């Protein structure tokens, strides 16, 4: 598949503490940025959700409370994520 881009496009994937959009939080976010010239940039961040990760959720994605205990919160990462996606179209 060939893309004809006028702006960069960022594809993103998240892992979370669950599927409830009101109470659950992100524990990992990955972004792949593709530029119109074909260059690529990618980043993955672990995120401290500031709440326990249920064992049944850890069994799905493998991310435990211990793994994110010393990671930044989403609020602490938000500016870096914004810097990566600010000039791009988004795709999930």
Cite the ranges covered by each PLM segment.
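Conserved non-catalytic scaffold segment of RNase H-like nuclease domains
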Residues: 1-92
